[in-house]
Amino acid sequence: MIITVTCNPSFDKTLEVPGFAPGRTLKARTLHRQPAGKGVNVSRCIAALGGRSVATGFLGQGEIPIYTSSFDQLQAVVDFVPVAGDTRQNVTIRDPERNAETHLREEGFSVAPADVAALERKLSELAAPGDVVIFSGSLPPGMQPADLARLVRLCAGAGCSVAVDSSGPALAEAVQPGVWLAKPNRDELEELVSRAVQSDDDVRRAAAELRETVEILLVTLGDDGAICFANDRAWKAAVKVDVVRNSVGTGDAFLAGFIVAHLEGQPPETCLRRAVACGAAATQELWAGQIDPAIVEKLLARVTLAEF
């Protein structure tokens, strides 16, 4: 089973505002609104690829029915810990005149120690040997990086393969012995090793340090693709797309693709190719957390892969 953990979920709202500029009164057209958050996006992409998952974490108690109904048609189960307060809203403002996007991120609800303890109990119930548990995204106010590290240890101790996709102190605390996979981008890799990472050799040296802790390291490079370090080898994969329709959630699609391929028994380099194709496919959709398997297969044929 795949378990996605989203501690700081959101509702993603997309507005279209031609000629957007601050300090003015402008008309906006609502294009889309959906339950989101990084782990939620991963679950949605896993479902698109034919996989099953359980989506858990924290959620404003009033929004649980909305999240549940949004997953009714997917091969995913919603099992969140309800907390007081409202789930945050993330707003993307699209300006078609400038072909530009502006992203606004609310802080959202706060969690109490009792909420963290409830999530710990939830994961104790859900996690079983052989499961893959994915911790994705930021932490809500009130939750400390040490809390995340404790949840990671709990799942690893239960015999699960733990994947971490976060940033800042939360990522630094979570990347610890027993973690199966970590997915930093270049900036996050610099944070983890506390120095600049610019050249290929810089990436290799940083990866060598982290590979003492994690089994698989995925370093995402945006338009330049991604690098996978595993089994004392490394590969770099990339694919070009002509038009990017959406940039939100591409890393979540990437991670979903890697995990699903891994559970199919594919070797790391094949998982990387699938992940890169999924991330690129996500740029062809209007909304985060959506990929078309047919587009994934077309892009997969164009993915370049080389030893790194």
What are these model-derived regions, one by one?
Residues 1-24:
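Positively charged, low-complexity intrinsically disordered leader regions
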Residues 145-234:
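Conserved phosphate/ATP/ADP-binding segment of small-molecule kinases
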Residues 92-129:
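Conserved phosphate-binding/catalytic loop of the ribokinase/pfkB sugar-kinase fold
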Residues 44, 91-93, 225-229:
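Short beta-strand scaffold segments in enzyme catalytic cores
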Residues 103-105, 130-138, 165, 183-188:
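Short beta-strands and strand-loop turn motifs
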Residues 27-87, 299-302:
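Substrate-binding N-lobe of the ribokinase-like
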Residues 172, 200-308:
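Conserved phosphate-binding/catalytic region of the ribokinase-like
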Residues 2, 52-54, 78, 162, ...:
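Hydrophobic anchor at the start of a short beta-strand
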